[in-house]
Amino acid sequence: MLQKTVAVNAQEITFNEFKKEVLNDYKIAKISRECSLLGRREVLTGKAKFGIFGDGKEVPQLAMAKAFKKGDFRSGYYRDQTFMMAIGELTAQQFFAGLYAHTDIKEDPMSAGRQMGGHFATHSLHENGSWKDLTKQYNSSSDISPTAGQMPRLLGLAQASKIYRNEKSVQHKTKFSDKGNEVAWGTIGNASTSEGLFFETINAAGVLQVPMVMSVWDDEYGISVHAKYQTTKESISEILKGFQRDNLHKGYEIFVINGWDYVQLMDVYQKAAKIAREQHVPVLIHVKELTQPQGHSTSGSHERYKDKDRLQWEKNHDCITKMREWILDFELETETGDILRFVDGEEDLIIIEKEAKKVVTNAKRNAWNAYLNEIKSELLAVTEILEGIAKKSVNGTFINKYKNDLVNITEPTKKDVLSIARKCLWYLRDEYFSEKIELQNFIKATLKDAHYKYSTHLTSETDLSSLEILEKKPTYAQDKNMVDARIIMRDNFDAILSKHQDVVIFGEDAGFIGDVNQGLEGLQEKYGNIRISDTGIREATIIGQGIGLAMRGLRPIAEIQYLDYLLYALQIMSDDLATLRYRTFGKQKAPLIIRTRGHRLEGIWHAGSPMGGIINNLRGIHVLVPRNMTKAAGFYNTLLAGDDPALVIECLNGYRLKEELPTNLGDFKTPIGIVETVKEGKDITVVSYGSTLRLVQDAAKDLAQVGIDVEIIDAQSLLPFDVTHDCVKSVAKTNKLLVVDEDVPGGASAYILQEILENQNGYQYLDSKPATLTSKAHRPAYGTDGDYFSKPSIEDIFEKVYDIMHEFNPQKFKSLY
């Protein structure tokens, strides 16, 4: 039989192969759609908590999947289920396991039940935390819900390819790149393009010229809000026309395509991939005329805000409906006059549709049974224990009632089982028999298992953890070599760049002038403008660059010029970087080091120390607060030996202070989570960190003149804090505690106080009320006097310590006022 060929995906294939591909695509689209439809019903009937699905976006995702190659990365959002199915990284059963929040990583490989369904990820790590070969698999960075939150990371994922292609020192890292030929694929909804993160990323990608293909799924709405309220001209491609490259300017290649046009979508995505992959030019694909057959999510119906005409238009332009029409209408005449068709008639498609529905129905049932069977086995175990208890307990009537309540729950949760078990234990507080011990053991085992399933992997738990890196002290020459402290930073970074060829450092003014405090002086000239580079004023995407680069095997150090500017990036640090390892159950990591400088210097905008907000928003990131540049340099060396993300806050007023230059630069290490007693004393423990610690040291000298012997502890690390509980050992000796910092009241000092008094049980050793000394609640005022009256001074520290000693021994320490 003569077979004709058809040009598809830039290669010649036979018609039968083309036919098979088209019909398989249609089946994937239908499976995805059925998952959305049935998923909504599962939520509305109470089996799942919430659903947000990709219906109405299926066909363009099929096209994207065909252009997506192994080694590529996706950074998208919660509409991309069809794409994940098309590349073979999501099955229908896994889709429902995620919907039910099944905590088995084998059942829900996206997050082990930690994220709501629709948040997709692939596994970048082996069980021991080491990297897989990312060039041999399809890669999806883990999704987050905040709209446009995927954008900054996308920039870094794309930039990694550019670095791997152009920087010879990293081209040996073949697990992460094949000569920089990988494309980073982004997806976003049309309404979310209104977010600042979108525009910041689009601009940065155009400047950097990175291989990024950005798809905008446009259904004209953002929940209930129409595009006319979202986007100027109601079209993101229209307002981004200025980014279109031309003969004189680098920029973007921009495509506009209807989301229901299967043939044109296939063509456009192949072209886009070729441009990005070969030329390293960013591409924007504006996919229009998409729909939302079920509205935004399970929380409401789009019939509340769309009129009948719009609903009918969406029904007519549903991308699967249009694909179905195209399949039925398709005819190709051969040279001999034969007519080739995909199907003989509608019956062929009905068979596919029934198969798709069957696949999804079975997948849903299997996923639900797998989820429920685990819980039912726990329920059975508790029921048997409670039956035995009811026979012996004086409160047997109450125990039986709880047992019967549990048995009568047709679809129990783990919460149901454990809640009743714990309540029954309350009735047994004065009774003792073997069944009570069984119940206690069950509760303990369940809580331990719950900790593993719900509360692990906040930071690295492997041998690669930064907490496993031991201290290595700096060594010094026999003759002291006192230098400006910034020289220690510069020379240590020089040693780092020489030792670690995968380290790249970037930020505002970090490149040509070597940062505003000269800690990178001359290093761009020595190592090139790829490894040491300037960026625009765009803090969120500086962090995004770092996240993406770190996820692709590089060791980025991203500089935020001042701690005050960190607020621009705090959202992406909190929502994306801090949660990455947790939300993937330890299957992805981004060991990004964020360098900044802060604490006291000058005025409202350059003297901030908002540590309370930072530590409470960044659980999952180490927060390190070295008191000098030697300690800071040691932290960088430690972090590069581990695989955790971290924020290092250098002392802004410390670069010109004199420190002794170590001889083992790049090698000495400051331990993370370990405090340092910088002065021993017997009367009171004072804990501080950063720039303020120097004031505490000065105040301690004055206090010694009046007979008060202060023990000074440098916290060094706020997250984690004092893992060896050395602070409480000091409090047990002095019986008094003062925490001093320059955050606002109730900030990091309150956190430290809780750590020592509550977590370390330091309360039991106190003879005096524990105290904090902080800055005022307002931002620090400008000028020398503004600083003096805004932040703790030497005199403030002296008098606070003296007041505590006066309260303890008023006869010896007379009142000052």
Regions found by a protein language model. Name each.
Residues 132-141, 149, 437-474, 619-623, ...:
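Helix-enriched interaction subdomains in cytosolic or periplasmic regions
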Residues 78-83, 188-194, 216-222, 258-263, ...:
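Acidic, glycine-rich active-site loops and adjacent beta-strand->loop/helix elements
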Residues 1-49, 70, 78, 458-470, ...:
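Cofactor-/ligand-binding subdomain signature composed of acidic, glycine-rich
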Residues 588, 598-602, 606, 611, ...:
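Active-site phosphate/pyrophosphate-binding segments
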Residues 58, 62, 139-420, 652-817, ...:
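Thiamine diphosphate
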Residues 397-545, 550-552, 564:
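Non-catalytic terminal/interface segments that mediate subunit docking, oligomerization
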Residues 6, 34-215, 220-222, 226-244, ...:
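Cofactor-binding active-site loop characterized by glycine-rich and histidine/acidic residues
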